[in-house]
Regions:
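Hinge/lid segment of periplasmic solute-binding proteins
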Residues: 42-92, 145, 149-151, 237-242
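A structural signal for short loop-to-beta-strand junctions that line the ligand-binding cleft
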Residues: 28-29, 36-37, 63-98, 129-131, ...
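Glycine-centered hinge/linker elements that transmit conformational signals in sensory
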Residues: 118-119, 164-198
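Extracytoplasmic "Venus flytrap"/periplasmic binding protein-like
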Residues: 3-68, 80, 96-102, 109, ...
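Short, solvent-exposed loop/beta-turn-alpha elements that line the ligand-binding surface or hinge
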Residues: 56-69, 133, 137-140, 155-180, ...
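Conserved C-terminal helix/tail region of periplasmic/extracytoplasmic solute-binding proteins
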Residues: 11, 99, 123, 289-291, ...
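Extracytoplasmic/periplasmic solute-binding protein
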Residues: 80-84, 89, 115-167, 213
Length: 373
């Protein structure tokens, strides 16, 4: 914003919300006479609260530069939100340890393959000196990886099978597959399932950094925590493979790629302010300075034609898989009913791992609470 003002003379004011307070801050800012002209939503559920404020971006220059229509949100025929950063997640893989166990990523092209490799590593864990998976921590710093990111896969495949993009009543068609993958994580890990309730995101990362496990479910945002100054890995040591759950065309499955960050323009603003906002957005994603700031300063991968090439290995893997014709798994978790719903699933998963709850409680939290919410 500062660089844009220096270049164009157009003042840009940025209001930053405290962590976890974006929606509350936006509500108070939108009630003011000088309400923001640019704001963001996290996906279809977030958009539902704000769609009456969203300017139709159809025909705008920024929409014309978007690399895929799947990164825009519509309300009827109107395009009302544009994803401005995309990320991928999957199984971050320590290739060196995998090779020590006698395998390469070419041996893992399905859930059945992954299960075979993981269980073989577990059988030889003492001899090898490492586990298959880092701890599937269910502390709040880590549980989103399972109650949200892993849970995305059964939702995505159900939507694909039913030809829909969201639903008021999830059926849970693929929850057995969700169970199989969660079981694989918790039974082939650095620790006992009963210890997972207290395990954190840092625990999981540190286990991976210390070569204690081959696989670590996380995303492209984790790259700088693993590679670079003072970090133990180089790009040659790591890769990312898809999260296979035994559904669909696994041979052609890509990483889970999408966004929870969409720009919207306030249609209540003066037209001159709307036009100035559209110019600023376009500058961010098309100019040399804007795209460099997005890529280098913020580490964003932006889904626009003029994007800078990312130095991030996991982004390169995603691009390579897509170029090979693999289908990325869309981020459908933005259609989950609420944080409350996710927490219900997380609590049920934690109890299941600890042995104090059964899988039926997970199914109830997933299916029944989706309907009631």
């Amino acid at each position: 914003a500062k660089t844009y003002t220096e270049e164009t003379g157009v003042p840009v004011t940025v209001v930053t919300a405290a962590s976890g307070q974006y929606e509350t801050t936006l509500m108070s800012e939108m009630a003011k006479s000088d309400a923001p002209t640019l704001f963001q939503v996290n996906g279809p559920v977030g958009l539902a609260n704000w769609k009456d404020y969203c300017y139709d971006l159809t025909g705008s220059k920024i929409l014309g530069d978007l690399t895929s229509d799947s990164y825009a949100l519509k309300d009827g025929d109107a395009t009302v939100a544009i994803g401005y950063v995309i990320e991928s997640y999957g199984l971050i893989t320590n290739k060196t340890l995998l090779e020590k166990a006698g395998y390469t990523t070419d041996d893992i092209k399905s859930f059945a393959d992954l299960k075979k490799v993981a269980e073989d590593i577990t059988a030889r864990k003492d001899e090898l000196g490492f586990a298959a998976f880092t701890s599937a921590g269910m502390d709040s710093s880590s549980d989103w990886r399972f109650k949200t990111h892993l849970a995305n896969l059964p939702i995505y495949f159900e939507y694909q099978a039913d030809g829909i993009g969201s639903t008021d009543a999830i059926k849970g068609t693929y929850l057995d597959n969700y169970k199989n993958m969660f079981d694989l994580y918790i039974n082939n890990s650095t620790c006992a399932p009963t210890e997972l309730a207290g395990k954190t995101g840092d625990d999981s990362r540190n286990e991976f950094l210390d070569n204690e496990a081959v696989f670590y479910q996380n995303g492209s945002w984790e790259y700088t925590n693993l590679v670079g100054d003072g970090k133990p890995f180089t790009d040659d040591d790591l890769t990312m493979i898809p999260v296979y759950i035994g559904v669909g065309d696994e041979a052609n499955q890509g990483l889970c790629t999408g966004t929870e960050n969409y720009w919207c323009v306030n249609k209540e603003a003066d037209q001159a302010d709307i036009d100035a906002t559209l110019d600023f957005m376009y500058w961010c994603v098309s100019s040399d300075e804007g795209t460099k700031a997005m890529a280098n300063d913020m580490g964003f991968v932006i889904p626009f034609k003029n994007a800078q090439e990312s130095p991030n290995l996991f982004v390169k893997v995603d691009n390579a898989l897509t170029a090979e014709g693999k289908t990325p798994v869309a981020w459908c978790f933005s259609t989950m009913p609420s944080e409350n719903w996710k927490n219900g699933v997380g609590s049920a998963l934690t109890a299941y791992a600890a042995g104090t709850g059964d899988w039926n409680a997970v199914v109830t939290a997933f299916v029944d609470r989706w309907k009631t919410e």
